[in-house]
Amino acid sequence: MQQESDDLLQKVRDFIKALENRSNSNDFTKFYHPEVVQTEYPNTLTKNTTTRMLKDLEAAATRGKQVLQKERYDIVNSYVAGNTVIVEAIYTGVLAIPVGKLKPGDEMKAWFAQIYEFKNGKIFRQRNYDCFENFF
């Protein structure tokens, strides 16, 4: 059981590294189950709860590459319970375009809680609770 927990946590760590280093959506979409559903709850950037399927996640990644020069996720805490991994992370994104009062090259910071549920070794459900610093 411990090995399975370690494997799931490592998959999430690898997924996050792929997000940080992405050059194309295949770098991270390989971690997703074909029937993935990602839910992002309201925050500074997303005013309403947003649900994304795989094709939506690919499109969001393309948009993200236009907004960010680079991004980093520093994992503060992580927990595994059954087929679920919970991660608390500090997010830093370096902007490529102006967002609110931030200019290109400025850092956008947030505190994330992310919940990943796995099915057949892939991320099947993902829930994001993102708390951004006020940049408007």
Language-model features: where?
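Short, charge-rich amphipathic segments
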Residues: M1-Q2, R13, Y41-L54, L95-A96, ...
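A beta-strand edge to alpha-helix "cap/lid" segment located at domain peripheries
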Residues: Q2-E4, E58-F136
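A solvent-exposed, acidic/Ser-Thr-rich amphipathic alpha-helical stretch
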Residues: S5, S25-G82
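Ligand-binding pocket scaffold of soluble enzyme catalytic domains
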Residues: L8
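Hydrophobic pocket/interface hotspot
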Residues: V12-F15, D27-T29, V36, M53, ...
